[in-house]
From Swiss-Prot:
Protein name (Swiss-Prot/TrEMBL): Arginine--tRNA ligase
Keyword Lipoprotein recorded: no
GO biological process, one term: arginyl-tRNA aminoacylation
Self-association state and partner proteins as the record states: Monomer.
Classification via InterPro entries: aa-tRNA-synth_I_CS, Arg-tRNA-ligase, Arg-tRNA-synth_N, Arg-tRNA-synth_N_sf, ArgRS_core, DALR_anticod-bd, Rossmann-like_a/b/a_fold, tRNAsynth_Ia_anticodon-bd
Lineage: Bacteria, Pseudomonadati, Pseudomonadota, Gammaproteobacteria, Alteromonadales
Keywords on record: Aminoacyl-tRNA synthetase, ATP-binding, Cytoplasm, Ligase, Nucleotide-binding, Protein biosynthesis
Places the protein is found: Cytoplasm
Molecular function terms from GO: arginine-tRNA ligase activity; ATP binding
Motif 'HIGH' region positions after renumbering to this chain: 126-136
Documented EC number(s): 6.1.1.19
Gene: argS
Length: 581
């Protein structure tokens, strides 16, 4: 409906241009917002006040001219001027009911599907040298929820798990694996069942033994030179490491698969060409033996030029080099219209520099959008990045296990007579959903305090609250199995019916914001408000005990659309719904 109002206003502006009220070459940005106070209508625009200078008219006078130029439309009940020149639109209730019925009968809930784009989404991307830890949670689940929403809108989404599967640390790890195999044979592979322990043990050997360190450095050279033995060990290590990652993805309900993995090593053969191409364009400089690029807009705190290091003095490449190669691949091979990078906010400067350089070097299509979807950190009670009590890194799998355990206690306390198998099934959904939703419901650009107590609460904007809200709505239909809704019509007579209907109609707008700005918290906030609107409706408007059969069926339709919207919204967040809690 919002886009429909915008379309009407654009037609009015075209008419005013023909009348000479505003210049024909003037392009106005038509902004329409939902009103908070329904006495001021359903939608409002400040367009008249925005045009007052160019039209040289009083904003209220101009607002009236805009209203007079609006085409007749059955979906708009009336239009009024308010205050200094706001234009308020009141939507016809029958039109709203028709819109909701269309949404109920549509797999996409009646949303306006945009022109499909090819969107590359770079997310999760852990280093394969260690097990996934809590620091990988945000990129993984925020990225996955936006991917789901993009696909729901009909876009061609290409997932890219840009894992860290290359670098000097792999020489250390391969040397340690080689050492263990010399001592224990093939059983040494079992040591990798705990990647953190394996990595720490390899690091200790590297720091304490010069001979080991020398072997590790030689293995790096051999690996980079394509040595078959080193590459075989490296592939085995990566395969085991990736298995750990995908076990975590499965527990999280994340849609990443092995075919989405395209690690740093994928671009090894392209890095030399990146350097040559930058040099051919006259962009490279030398600084202390390294090959760098200086860009005028990037300075240090002291005002000195801030370089992008492309190749180290020893010939090694850096993240910037592989990122540039990846951007060129995503533009030229994958033909991406957009590339979204779900990476920690602290990498913001890095992405500003490489995005700018990719354009300057003409590595990407000039129309391609590069977007860093940065996020804050998950912190403990002390406001610092989440750690174990001993100060160590928290493995993501350990966090999820504790969430399952706490959720089981919670569900058992609510359902003491439920059998163990069902308790565990429900607790698994509640535990994982609570961790995911607690993160997704926060503005991704903000840090937040991790709290099991808050995320497992049945009060407030939490997963348990929304999961219960869904079961409450779905439960109505368990008591209405014999009611035929095929000929039912939706009526919005009560204020609470209208409030719920208006909230349901906002789903498409919220989804658009989520995929445009990469903000799952917008969808979380909407679902929480929708659950609240349904609760108010349910208390004020009896459904199964309605005054008439016609009213009962109408309210069942509203309830059905609410359940469908809650379920779809939670699914886009990667959260499974329950029929019973």
């Amino acid at each position: 409906m919002k886009s429909h109002i915008q379309s009407l206003l654009i037609q009015a502006l075209d008419a005013l241009k023909q009348q000479g009220v505003i210049p024909t070459d003037f392009e106005a940005r038509v902004q329409v917002d939902r009103t908070k106070d329904k006495t001021h209508g359903d939608f409002a625009t400040n367009l008249a006040m925005m045009l007052t200078k160019v039209a040289r008219k009083n904003p209220r006078e101009l607002a009236q001219l805009i209203i007079d130029s609006l085409p007749q439309d059955s979906q708009v009940a009336k239009v009024e001027i308010a205050g200094p020149g706001f234009i308020n639109f009141f939507i016809d209730e029958n039109a709203l009911a028709s819109q909701l019925m269309a949404a109920l009968n549509d797999d996409h809930l009646g949303i306006q599907l945009p022109e499909p784009q090819t969107v590359v989404v770079d997310y999760s991307s852990p280093n394969l040298a260690k097990e996934m830890h809590v620091g990988h949670l945000r990129s993984t689940i925020i990225g996955d929820s936006v991917v789901r929403a993009l696909e729901f809108q009909g876009h061609n989404v290409i997932r890219q798990n840009h894992v860290g599967d290359w670098g000097t640390q792999f020489g250390m790890l391969l040397a340690y694996m080689e050492e263990l195999r010399a001592e224990n044979g093939e059983q040494a592979q079992m040591e990798l069942s705990d990647l953190e322990t394996f990595y720490r043990a390899a690091k200790v050997r590297f720091d304490e033994s010069e001979d080991f360190a020398i072997r590790a450095r030689k293995l790096v050279v051999s690996l980079q030179s394509g040595d078959e033995y080193c590459n075989k060990l490296w592939r085995e290590f990566n395969d085991i490491s990736l298995s750990h990652c995908h076990d975590v993805y499965e527990r999280l309900g994340v849609s990443l698969t092995r075919k989405d993995v395209r690690g740093e090593s994928t671009y090894n053969d392209d890095l030399e060409q990146v350097v040559k191409d930058l040099d051919a364009k006259g962009l490279l400089s030398e600084s202390n033996g390294a090959k760098v690029v200086f860009q005028d807009e990037f300075k240090t705190k002291d005002g000195d030029p801030l370089p992008v290091i492309i190749q180290k003095a020893d010939g090694g490449y850096l993240y910037a080099t592989s990122d540039l190669a990846a951007m060129r691949y995503r533009s030229n091979v994958l033909k991406a219209d957009r590339a979204l990078y779900f990476v920690d906010l602290r990498q913001g400067l890095h992405f500003q520099q490489v995005f700018k350089l990719a354009r300057t070097a003409e590595f990407i299509n000039p129309d391609m959008s590069l977007e860093h979807m940065g996020f804050g950190t998950m912190n403990g009670d002390d406001g610092r990045p989440f750690k174990t009590r001993s100060g160590g890194v928290v493995k993501l799998v350990d966090l999820l296990t504790e969430a399952d355990t706490r959720a089981l206690e919670l569900v058992r306390s609510k359902n003491p007579d439920m059998d163990q198998a069902e308790l565990e099934k429900i607790a698994k959904v509640v535990g994982i959903s609570s961790v995911k939703y607690a993160d997704l419901s926060k503005n991704r650009a903000s840090d937040y305090i991790f709290s099991f107590e808050q995320m497992l609460s049945f009060e407030g904007n939490t997963a348990p609250y929304l999961l219960y809200a869904y079961t409450r709505v779905a439960g109505i239909f368990k008591r209405a199995t014999d009611i035929d809704l095929s000929d039912a019509k939706m009526q919005l007579d009560h204020d609470k019916e209208k409030d719920l209907g208006n909230k349901l109609a906002q789903f498409g707008e919220v989804l658009s914001r989520m995929v445009t700005k990469g903000q799952p918290h917008a969808l979380c906030g909407y679902l929480f408000e929708l659950a609240g609107a349904f609760s108010s409706f349910y208390e004020a408007c009896p459904v199964l005990a309605a005054e008439s059969e016609e009213q009962k069926k109408s309210r069942l339709l509203l309830s059905q659309l609410t359940a469908k919207t809650l379920k779809q919204g939670l699914d886009l967040l990667g959260i499974e719904t329950l029929e019973r809690m």
